[in-house]
Amino acid sequence: ELFDWQSIPAVKALAGSPRITPPFKPHLEDKLWLALLWSPALKKIWEQTLRGSHLKRLRELVPFGWVLDPTPLPPHAALPKINVHSWDEVADFSQKERQLVLKISGFHETAWGSRGVFIGHDMPGPEWSERLHSALDLSSEQPWIVQEFREGRRIEHPVFRDDGSVEMMQG
């Protein structure tokens, strides 16, 4: 992991020393958790593991998501919230329906720095379809997720300076 290690002075100084695997904070680096939060099969586990107010807040902050899985759904089933029977239908969504984000997950050279992130409505339909089908084909080797798209926004937040002072900034 740490594909950008050369830009981190402390890690660069250790180059060739210890071998570190998995990454330093795997629980923060794997996007799969973003989709698993919404898995109906895990609902009770999340409710038992997390305080109610914390789970509620996480669900407010984390856009709804799905683990990309090529396994066919039973005839009577549908993907939650988008109510389609297959990823092929999602691949054929119109630009308006493609308010979705496709993301590679796990520990891969394209899983950081937005290298493996594709915004559905920002790309032509054929390219969206190709990316989605490619991710489905690769899903047995590398996990992928799809999330609802949400517009970013600027907020005011504290920045803690080395001298102990706190400055409010927009970001």
Model-derived segments and spans:
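Domain-scale recognition of functional cores that engage charged ligands
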Residues: 1-171
